[in-house]
From Swiss-Prot:
This is one of the proteins that bind and probably mediate the attachment of the 5S RNA into the large ribosomal subunit, where it forms part of the central protuberance. In the 70S ribosome it contacts protein S13 of the 30S subunit (bridge B1b), connecting the 2 subunits; this bridge is implicated in subunit movement. Contacts the P site tRNA; the 5S rRNA and some of its associated proteins might help stabilize positioning of ribosome-bound tRNAs. Gene3D superfamilies: 3.30.1440.10. One of its GO terms (cellular component) is ribosome. HAMAP family: Ribosomal_uL5_B. Signal peptide: none annotated. Pfam families: Ribosomal_L5 (PF00281), Ribosomal_L5_C (PF00673). Part of the 50S ribosomal subunit; part of the 5S rRNA/L5/L18/L25 subcomplex. Contacts the 5S rRNA and the P site tRNA. Forms a bridge to the 30S subunit in the 70S ribosome. The gene is rplE. InterPro entries: Ribosomal_uL5, Ribosomal_uL5_bac-type, Ribosomal_uL5_C, Ribosomal_uL5_CS, Ribosomal_uL5_dom_sf, Ribosomal_uL5_N. Belongs to the universal ribosomal protein uL5 family. It comes from Nitrobacter winogradskyi (strain ATCC 25391 / DSM 10237 / CIP 104748 / NCIMB 11846 / Nb-255). GO terms for biological process: translation. This is Large ribosomal subunit protein uL5.
Length: 185
């Protein structure tokens, strides 16, 4: 008896209804023309890591908890004297999510984390880059349920970039709206 492979809820919803809705809306003739999610990039810049290397490691640990995948510490490429920054100093961390972990993260972001943001009025509908990708900033990483509020020493912000295969911003907006992204009106 063959076991069925795990399919995230949002991926199943995309295969079942979203893909056909987008095909009708934009009149695609080929299945490969329908936009889909490609990857999600989480980036956390830590300016204080210049003075204390442990802060970059702590931020990478928190980002790993949020993403469910190991985050990599990013290092400076050039020295900038005004920021007291030397070459190869840790300045942040990042992680790229694809496939199953990407769909699970987007599900947690839209349904759990964003509703926990104070004074949340919706996502900015103008944050598309012109090529079908969407970026948003989160001011406090403690809105995610994986982070224990009592054990966090500092609260950091992070950038979330959702990359899609859409050719235009309108196609990407329709795709993300179908995934229940709460855009402002």
């Amino acid at each position: 008896m063959a076991e069925t492979a795990y399919v995230p809820r949002l991926r199943a919803e995309y295969d079942k209804s979203i893909r056909s809705r987008l095909t009708e809306q934009f009149g695609y003739v080929n299945v490969m023309q329908v936009p889909r999610l490609d990857k999600v990039v989480l980036n956390m810049g830590i300016g204080e890591a210049v003075n204390d290397r442990k802060k970059a490691e702590a931020a990478a640990g928190d980002l790993s908890l949020i993403a469910g995948q190991k985050a990599v510490v990013t290092y400076s490429r050039v020295a900038i004297s005004t920021f007291k920054l030397r070459e190869n100093q840790p300045i942040g961390c990042k992680v790229t999510l694809r496939k199953t972990k990407m769909y699970e993260f987007i599900d947690r972001l839209v349904n759990v984390a964003l509703p926990r943001v104070r004074d949340f009025r919706g996502l900015n509908p103008k944050s598309f880059d012109g090529r079908g990708n969407y970026s948003l900033g989160i001011k406090e990483h403690i809105i995610f349920p994986e982070i224990d509020f009592d054990k966090v020493g500092e609260s950091w912000g992070m950038d979330v970039t959702v990359c899609t295969t859409a050719q235009t911003d309108d196609e990407a907006r329709a795709l993300l709206t179908a995934f229940n992204f709460p855009f402002r009106q």
